[in-house]
Amino acid sequence: MTIRNYNYHMTHFVISAPDIRHLPRDEGIEVAFAGRSNAGKSSALNTLTNQKGLARTSKTPGRTQLINLFEVVDGVRLVDLPGYGYAEVPEEMKLKWQRALGEYLQKRNCLKGLVVLMDIRHPLKDLDQQMITWAVAVGTPVLLLLTKADKLASGACKAQLNLVREAIIPFMGDIQVEAFSSLKKIGVDKLREKLDTWFSEIPPEVMAEEFDGEGE
């Protein structure tokens, strides 16, 4: 497989949807970003794409209530899933979000990778583990980003990385763990490399259409 380097700075917003029934057709390739409401998911997307306002950041956790799609190039999409685990959201809303998350992860055939973001100081909460379990159950590879790595000293950061890497062994899945910081740009290259690898598995017919378009 040839790994293609994508220009994530060209990423643009496509649509917001309450559930998978309102998403575009299940084709091409998608990589989803999931995480607790305060895990730094929007900041990570903005850092990845070098666009400050691509994914909305908020001082109020739980603002991402919809599935937000962003297109890198034709047929290649990043998906910002609803943040989970925010205590002040009504229980009915929490359950609705969790249903939407589970349905997307288990039924969206074009999903080729899942990025789960967790605060490095508080990793692998119950809902984080649920995301991993859903992904592993359908054979979706996972990249765990331990965010806000700048909050810890180097030694403590490495210790947390090792702890999480050991803790995920029982999941028996294709799971990679990396430290990440939007502020200090830690782990951004690792994220891009993983996305490039996943997106290079794009169906040949989509890739052919894309290159035909470039030649016009």
From Swiss-Prot:
Pfam families: MMR_HSR1 (PF01926)
Gene3D superfamilies cross-referenced by the UniProt entry: P-loop containing nucleotide triphosphate hydrolases
Positions of Mg(2+) binding: S42, T64
Any single Gene Ontology cellular-component annotation: cytosol
GO molecular function terms listed in the Swiss-Prot or TrEMBL record: GTP binding; metal ion binding
CDD domains attached to this UniProt entry: YihA_EngB
UniProt domain EngB-type G: residue ranges: 27-201
Binding residues for GTP: 35-42, 62-66, 80-83, 147-150, 180-182
Keyword Nucleotide-binding: yes
Record has Magnesium as a keyword: yes
Cofactor requirement: Mg(2+)
GO biological process: division septum assembly
Keywords for this protein: Cell cycle, Cell division, GTP-binding, Magnesium, Metal-binding, Nucleotide-binding, Septation
HAMAP family in the record: GTPase_EngB
Function: Necessary for normal cell division and for the maintenance of normal septation.
Family the UniProt entry places it in: Belongs to the TRAFAC class TrmE-Era-EngA-EngB-Septin-like GTPase superfamily. EngB GTPase family.
Protein known as: Probable GTP-binding protein EngB
Organism ancestry: Bacteria, Pseudomonadati, Pseudomonadota, Gammaproteobacteria, Enterobacterales
